[in-house]
UniProtKB/Swiss-Prot annotation:
Name assigned to this protein: Nucleolar protein 16
InterPro entries cross-referenced by the UniProt entry: Ribosome_biogenesis_Nop16
Gene: nol-16
Keywords, comma-separated and alphabetical: Nucleus
Localization annotation: Nucleus, Nucleolus
Keyword presence, Nucleus: yes
Entry similarity comment: Belongs to the NOP16 family.
Any single Pfam family the record assigns to this protein: Nop16
Native source species: Caenorhabditis elegans
Bias (Basic residues): 1-33
GO biological process, one term: ribosomal large subunit biogenesis
Domain of life: Eukaryota
Region spans: Disordered: 1-34
């Protein structure tokens, strides 16, 4: 007589599959510690924790701790001392954690990061921003300009305004269209 339910044995332990899982996790951990910034990638120490690495570089691990927000404390106004009781408002103490960092290395890393940011900003400032609209939006802008000119209120009431753009949205879209390369191409043709 055959069984209706198949009997299952103990699941087999496959060393190869478990080793693959372990190696994959290990690779993912390594990927997390890598940074796109070359100076951070160069000074990163695999043996240290991320918090220790960042502290040694002189960078803030938690920006909220680095630049604390001033807490509004209620001042005691017109408080009259009672006999035998003194009122003392404690000042908050600064919490210092961790070991000393290498000051020269930290200064070097920070100066390199600042220099890299300046170079990126200069490169961005040199480039003109390119505006693009989708092909359908370009057609719509050309149609609206031909039909209504610069009257954004009329564009809003037009039956082809399927997305129900407001006059401000039309103004922005038309400005973007005029700054785009497609508009310049259409004007020259």
């Amino acid at each position: 007589m055959a069984r209706d339910v198949k009997k299952r044995g103990k699941p087999a332990y496959t060393n190869r599959r478990n080793r693959q899982k372990y190696l994959k996790k290990k690779d993912n951990k390594k990927k997390l510690s890598k940074s796109a910034v070359p100076i951070i990638k160069y000074t990163w120490d695999e043996t240290k924790t991320p918090r220790e690495n960042v502290r040694d570089m002189g960078i803030a691990f938690n920006p909220n701790d680095a630049v604390p927000i001033a807490e509004h404390r209620k001042e005691i106004i017109d408080a009259e001392p009672i006999d035998g009781v003194s009122i003392v408002v404690p000042k908050p103490e600064k919490k210092v954690t961790g070991r000393k960092k290498n000051e020269k290395q930290a200064a070097h890393i920070i100066s390199n990061l600042e220099q890299q940011v300046k170079e990126e900003e200069e490169a961005r400032a040199g480039q003109d921003r390119k505006f693009r609209l989708f092909h359908r939006e370009t057609e719509l802008c050309v149609y609206m300009l031909a039909r209504h000119g610069e009257d954004f209120q009329a564009m809003t009431r037009d039956p082809k305004n399927l997305w129900q753009y407001t006059p401000k949205q039309w103004a922005k879209k038309i400005r973007t269209h005029k700054e785009s390369e497609m508009c310049k191409f259409l004007e020259t043709a």
